[in-house]
Amino acid sequence: MKLTPREKDKLLIFTAALLAERRRARGLKLNYPETIAFITAALMEAARDGKTVAEVMHYGTTLLTRDDVMEGVPEMIPDIQVEATFPDGTKLVTVHHPIP
């Protein structure tokens, strides 16, 4: 299988997000990389599902709480930017303060 660099990045994000999801389900608090992967993958999937940019931006703030992540992680993530594929093309989505 031959993948483009972008496809490899998406696959890596998905794999890291899957690991984060499993750890969260076991009651573990997510660290910085797990948190980024979890939110990024969810945003990409929401865009793929046909949500608007505004809906995806709002959705990004509802995924995790401070109780879901390790201490200090929310302060390390002032915003997340993701290039997501929407039905009408690829767009840059920015979520400010993803962990309220």
Swiss-Prot record:
Its main location: cytoplasm. Signal peptide: none annotated. This is Urease subunit gamma. GO terms for molecular function: nickel cation binding; urease activity. Pfam families: Urease_gamma. One of its GO terms (biological process) is urea catabolic process. It comes from Burkholderia thailandensis (strain ATCC 700388 / DSM 13276 / CCUG 48851 / CIP 106301 / E264). The keyword Transmembrane does not apply. The keyword Cytoplasm applies. Pathway: Nitrogen metabolism; urea degradation; CO(2) and NH(3) from urea (urease route): step 1/1. NCBIfam families: PRK13241.1, urease_gam. Heterotrimer of UreA (gamma), UreB (beta) and UreC (alpha) subunits. Three heterotrimers associate to form the active enzyme. It comes from the Bacteria. Belongs to the urease gamma subunit family. InterPro entries: Urease_gamma, Urease_gamma/gamma-beta_su, Urease_gamma_sf, Urease_subunit. It is found in: Cytoplasm.
